[in-house]
Every structure is written in structure tokens, then in C-alpha cells.
Design a protein with these regions (language model features):
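Rossmann-like dinucleotide-binding core of oxidoreductases
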Residues: 3-10, 14-36, 43-45, 136, ...
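FAD-dinucleotide binding site
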Residues: 4-10, 32, 47, 52-55, ...
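Alpha-helical recognition domains of nuclear gene-regulatory proteins
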Residues: 28, 49, 98-101
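Short, charged helix-to-loop "capping" segments that act as catalytic/coupling loops
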Residues: 29-35, 75-76, 103-108, 123-124
Length: 249
């Protein structure tokens, strides 16, 4: 969608973010309720956290057949997961598949970061201002930015004097990073650190991990999904959906 907007256009609903939640909201608001809906996405493509977090080893720690949309039987039957715990690239491919299958891309404006939201109490309308000073108006606004949309960069003394390369798992470059024959330090052993450490260690000359608080970690026991499992899952979609809904309560 073009970034140039006609400011006279008022949308029924504007969704901020094109990750899992944003895509689902666009589908429900546009296709099920019939609202004129627009998604504003800061990135260049859909994916949300799976667009930004593309560090080595990035992977979901929920099983693939539970980490997906259940509102569309067509998507459930046409998409095949390859692993028990899918990696970042596969999840991103899945979200692009969902976007194209449901025809959502036409209602998403990329490279558009919302910087301010104001409510006009006289006109009962939301006014959204973006980083390029464009304005959008909507009766409803849905924030679907999630809890992982902003990278937390620690303030460490001397960082500005460091002459080497600095990377953050939440702001990983799209192009591959070569760690061959390099000394690497990783700060933190949360989920991102645990996933990245063994992958980076394969190529780095030396790897040092800085850990503040020891944690308990067990092997993921990841595995490829067999054709038998996929077939069984697709034949019992209603059962799995019922079980997952019950597990929420």
C-alpha cells in the first residue's frame, strides 16, 4: 500500500502491528465484521517479533501445531509444519502464507511507525500520527505491538568506545553475520541467549557467556514431524482445538 494517504479518509479500525495478533485482528475486523480496516506496520514485511528477531537459533518454544491460527480450516489443512518447534524462518514463511491466503496484504501499510495517538473527544475519533508526520483517523484502534516489539539495550559503560561489532538479538540484521575466527561475548542466558549460544559457538574462535542469574535449562528434544503425525493432526483438528481451548481455563 502506498504511504501517501488521503487525510480525509477515516477508517473504522486501525491496527498497529502486523504480527500474529495484528493479522488475526485484520481478518476478523475486515472479513467477519465488515469494518474498513488498515494495519500500520513499522517493518518492511509481516511477522512482528518473527520479522525483527532473526538471530542465529531463533525458534519458538511452543509446539508448532499449537502455535498457529485455528480460525481457518483452509490454512490448517494446506500448511504443513516441518518441526515440533519451528524456527524463525519457518514461522515467518507461515505468516506470509496466512497473509496471502487471506488476502491481507492489501490492507497493510509497511514502513509506517506510529509515534502518537490522540483521541478527539468532540468528534469521537482517534488520530494517529506516524514518524513521517502522516495522520490517520479511526473510530477504533487496536494495539497489536506485543511485548517484544522494543529491544532492551542495556546501558553499559564503555560501549561507545568499543571498536568491535555490536548486535542485539531483537535488532538482528537481515544479512547473515559471520563469526568465523572472532572472539564473541554474549550477555544473558534468557531464551534468546540459550538459543543463540550453541549456534554461534560452532563458528566463533572463542565464545564467552556473561550470566547474571543461573537458570535451569533442559534439551528441547526438537524433531522433524513425520507424515503420519501431520496426517493424524489434520484428521483431528476439532479435537486439538477443543483441548487447547480447555487448557486456557
Amino acid at each position: 500500500m502506498s504511504i501517501n494517504q488521503n487525510l480525509s479518509i477515516t477508517y473504522d479500525a486501525i491496527v498497529i502491528g502486523a504480527g500474529f495478533s495484528g493479522l488475526q485482528q485484520l481478518h476478523f475486523l475486515r472479513d467477519r465484521i465488515g469494518l474498513k480496516t488498515l494495519v500500520l506496520e513499522a517493518g518492511e514485511a509481516v511477522g512482528g517479533t518473527w520479522y525483527w528477531n532473526r538471530y542465529p537459533g531463533a525458534r519458538c518454544d511452543s509446539e508448532s501445531h499449537t502455535y498457529c491460527f485455528y480460525f481457518s480450516e483452509k490454512i490448517l489443512k494446506e500448511w504443513n509444519w516441518s518441526e515440533r518447534y519451528p524456527g524463525q524462518k519457518e514461522i515467518l514463511n507461515y505468516l506470509n502464507f496466512v497473509t496471502d491466503t487471506l488476502g491481507l496484504r492489501a490492507n497493510i501499510q509497511f514502513n509506517t511507525r506510529v509515534k502518537l495517538i490522540q483521541y478527539d473527544q468532540i468528534k469521537n475519533i482517534w488520530i494517529l500520527k506516524t514518524a513521517d508526520d502522516s495522520e490517520f483517523r479511526a473510530k477504533y484502534v487496536v494495539s497489536a505491538v506485543g511485548c517484544l516489539s522494543s529491544a532492551n539495550s542495556p546501558e553499559i559503560s564503555g560501549t561507545n568506545k568499543f571498536m568491535g561489532e555490536l548486535y542485539h538479538t531483537g535488532k538482528w540484521p537481515h544479512e547473515p553475520v559471520d563469526f568465523a575466527n572472532k572472539k564473541v561475548g554474549i550477555i544473558g542466558t534468557g531464551s534468546s541467549g540459550i538459543q543463540a549460544i550453541p549456534i554461534i559457538a560452532r563458528s566463533a574462535k572463542n565464545l564467552t557467556v556473561f550470566q547474571r542469574t543461573p537458570n535451569f535449562s533442559v534439551p528441547a528434544r526438537n524433531s522433524k514431524l513425520s507424515d503420519e503425525f501431520i496426517s493424524k493432526f489434520k484428521s483431528k483438528i476439532a479435537y486439538y482445538k477443543k483441548e487447547m481451548l480447555a487448557a486456557r481455563h
